[in-house]
Amino acid sequence: MTKFFSHGKLLITGEYVVLDQALSLAIPTKKGQHMLIKEFAEEPRTLFWKSLGDDGNAWFEQKFLIQKKTKSNNNSVICDPNAQNKNEVAEMLVRILNKAISLNVDFLADKSYQVKTRLEFDRSWGLGSSSTLMCNIDKWAE
């Protein structure tokens, strides 16, 4: 099992303009987001994702398929076509994971995975549920 943790952040200045590449000031928080990854052998290769809130309840669950690399394309992640619960979160996660694959072609290359994330803070607080997720995925994909 592989574990990652990233601290949340409290933006002091530039809360919205930072998205347009403006300088901002932030301080890390004690609370953050955990990510646990279990690898296993399964065909077709799959990625089972479960996100827990600070209350321990699942707020997102999705099964993804990892498509094999071809001569012209890297591996890629897609939502399971049979999944009933595809949504914006799933589509955003697909984009993030595929970007990570484009930066490291060996990422998600040969196994199936079970990923569980857990926030230590309420998602509505604005402490960085997305940025801590991206940081954890970056660490995993290195």
Predicted regions and their residues:
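DPxDG-like acidic metal-binding loop motif
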Residues: 125-142
